Amino acid sequence: MRFNREPFDANVYSRPKTELLKPFVFFITASILILQGCDIINPKEKEPAYLYIPSFTFQANLNQGTSSEAITEVWVYADDQSLGVFDLPAKIPILDLGTSNIRIFAGIKNNGISNTRIRYPFYAPFDTTLTISAFQIDTLIPHFSYYNLAVISEKGFESGNFFVQTGSNNGSFSVTNQADQVFEGNRSGWGHIDTGLSHLLYKDDENLFYQSGNNVFLEMNYSSNNIFSVGFITTTGGITSKNVALIINPSSSGDGLSPVWKKIYIDFGYVLQQNPTAQFHELYIESIPANSSTPVNIFLDNLKWVTW
């Protein structure tokens, strides 16, 4: 029996060691490139620092009326870059380390509506500079106040009632000094519709000042057991008209004689823009009972007209 043998090729068995290692070297190189590529695609995350804001303070100057406020959140910026809007207390991550200029604005519910939150234009921001390091937690309690340029006119009821009856209605508006019905100080305003009666409409007959095109807000402390509206009675060429700015929901229940006080910021800018030629703007409040068997009780205090 004969076996056929292939001719012996010495070159196959005498390759240099470097050629034998080529596949292994290629594998290692490819692996390194893949790992480096992962670092490029998914770079190592920065280690953040944190800004902790547990609360805030607010104070109006002596000539700016009450320090009552309804600030609901803070708008936070680092070097003019927004970090977000936060309810308090808040722990806020900061990725850009080093020296940072922190600016914090006070936010409110415009017209008392949760879905229309804004930076209140008349509250000055809180500013500070921090040197920020990774894992560091800096605690800030921002202090807010009105801008000095804000033009503020406040009316309370310490000196008596300034609302007068207008039109045909059978409600009443007076002043209460009963301690458990007064918001602050010694007196608050009290609107009342007795059982079986149907309508309250009262106005402040002082013309309210504002500059066209500027922000215009009415701040107010209130308690009510019935829906009521706030707006302007305008006079143009001897013709008067009633312009609703906001319809306000009840804050209390039952007969409303135990007030549940709230603070609201009412944006009057839009209403005023609809009446650019009016000579007079008089603030009014109005209410119609939802239930004729339940008396209506509306308590007001610190009506603050704020503009520039």
Model-assigned labels for residue ranges:
Residues 78, 96-115:
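A short, solvent-exposed beta-strand micro-motif common in secreted/extracellular proteins
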Residues 139-171, 298-304:
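Extracellular carbohydrate-recognition regions
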Residues 157-158, 204-228, 266, 303:
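Extra-cytoplasmic beta-strand recognition segments
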Residues 173-200:
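Short carbohydrate-recognition loop motifs
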Residues 217, 221-269:
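Extracellular ligand-binding interfaces
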Residues 220, 263-298, 303:
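Extracellular beta-strand ligand-recognition surfaces/modules
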